[in-house]
């Protein structure tokens, strides 16, 4: 079969895996309230808002997912070199990473909550721990497995020269950064502050004054993930999937058109710059359209 067709097929599969990974990563961070929005959850009890959110900001998402995916990639790489089937090795590696993820989540939740219990009266809700840890580990496993799968395809089928653990680390940092910058806005700026008028941002005076009541009963992280699965999660997945696909696509275009290595690299760089410029123009047009359509926030 034509090597170009094999590369295109592997790239399409890697892009699809990255899309699923980005969506699952964002929803996992919504269940556990990690990264940027967690600062508001941490401030909640200090503002008198006793809540039932799962408070587990172990670190920023880029660092934590860099760790999880690197653990999965390292275990899978060792097992593959030992002669184990690649798919089974990726599953086992992702399972080990899920255990690490769960251990960090439990310790972070208990440590951060206990630190606020005496002075600010925030209880440690054990039912929140037991009900949230499953979705956290489950979403995390999906995100890590699809991410390490994309890294494996990059190494074996797309010609990436670096070893699997290093590529997995880079991909994990990338998906964490995208989830933190793209999907968390939907959770932190909207879901946590639905009692305030939409579009007003989060003034300093309102920080920590988060919503503690849901549509029915007391709000928790599971409610947040359900809400964000309609917009924040899919947008995170789409963003990361497009990055993986377009980055690989520019390299394939360079290999098809170019002759020697320098020409291939130059064409790939030019195509990449054109994609970035097109994305900037499209982003600007969407922003101007939205401002003209809905107008400035006046209150």
Curated annotation (Swiss-Prot):
Enzyme class: translocase
Organism: Methanococcus vannielii (strain ATCC 35089 / DSM 1224 / JCM 13029 / OCM 148 / SB)
Transmembrane annotation, as ranges: 57-77, 80-100, 133-153, 158-178, 237-257, 261-281
Pfam families in alphabetical order: MtrE (PF04206)
Known partners and oligomeric status: The complex is composed of 8 subunits; MtrA, MtrB, MtrC, MtrD, MtrE, MtrF, MtrG and MtrH.
Function: Part of a complex that catalyzes the formation of methyl-coenzyme M and tetrahydromethanopterin from coenzyme M and methyl-tetrahydromethanopterin. This is an energy-conserving, sodium-ion translocating step.
Annotated pathway: One-carbon metabolism; methanogenesis from CO(2); methyl-coenzyme M from 5,10-methylene-5,6,7,8-tetrahydromethanopterin: step 2/2
Assigned keywords, A-Z: Cell membrane, Membrane, Methanogenesis, Methyltransferase, One-carbon metabolism, Transferase, Translocase, Transmembrane, Transmembrane helix
Recorded GO MF terms: tetrahydromethanopterin S-methyltransferase activity
Catalytic activity: 5-methyl-5,6,7,8-tetrahydromethanopterin + coenzyme M + 2 Na(+)(in) = 5,6,7,8-tetrahydromethanopterin + methyl-coenzyme M + 2 Na(+)(out)
Membrane topology of the entry: Multi-pass membrane protein
Entry EC number(s): 7.2.1.4
Sequence similarity: Belongs to the MtrE family.
Name of the protein in its database record: Tetrahydromethanopterin S-methyltransferase subunit E
GO BP terms in the entry: methanogenesis, from carbon dioxide; methylation; one-carbon metabolic process
InterPro entries hit by this protein: MeTrfase_E (IPR005780)
Record bears the keyword NAD: no
Recorded GO CC terms: cytoplasm; plasma membrane; vesicle membrane
Stored NCBIfam families: mtrE
Lineage of the species this protein comes from: Archaea, Methanobacteriati, Methanobacteriota, Methanomada group, Methanococci
Subcellular location: Cell membrane
